[in-house]
Structures are given as C-alpha cells and as structure tokens.
Amino acid sequence: MNKRVVTFGEIMLRLAPNGYYRFFQNDQLQATFGGGEANVAVSLANYGLDSVYVTKLPSHAIGQAAVNALRSFGVDTSHIVRGGDRVGIYFLEKGASQRGSVCIYDRAHLSLIHI
C-alpha cells in the first residue's frame, strides 16, 4: 500500500508583473496559483509521492483553474470542497537589486473560512 501525504490549507491566486517590473510600470499581470500547503503538495507529487490537497474553493472558473493547476502536477484534488464566493489573491512585485519584493494580500471573505 502506498502512503499518501495530505495537506490542508489555502491556495491563492498570485498576480505579478512580468520580470522585475513594478506594479505601476506594467499593464499586464501574470496569473499563477500558490500557497504554502499547495506548494508542498505539488513538490511531493513532483518527487513521485501520492499527495492529496484539501481545501474549499468556489465553484466558478477561477476556483476550477486552481483545481486544474494542482491536477496538472499530479496532486489528488478529489477532497476539495466546492462552495463560497472568493479565492484569496496576492499581488507580488519581485524585488530587484536593492529594492525588496512587495506582497499585497486580499483575503477577505474567503471560501476556506466557511469550511
């Protein structure tokens, strides 16, 4: 029997300017998904371990995109509960040289808090 690792947490939509541009220097944002526990599940799946991710996500297209992102790395998403209205968002501006990175969180009224 294969052992499985189960992670539980919040996956968030990350919006970031391309490269090392600042928010006000760019009119496009790159969208990806991340979060501590989701990142662990993906890393374990990349090492060939059975990893399961548990969370709550809305039933709309952004929630499904988060599920699809996890599945694309081989993470088992069958225990994700669907419901609520919001996915957490964070905006990340990568630092360059002496300028540090900037991270702004928008986590109000998340689906996960009602699990």
Task: Give short role names for the model-derived ranges.
Residues D85, A96-S97:
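Short strand-connecting beta-turns/loops that link adjacent beta-strands
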Residues I113-I115:
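Conserved small/polar residues in nucleotide/adenosyl-binding loops
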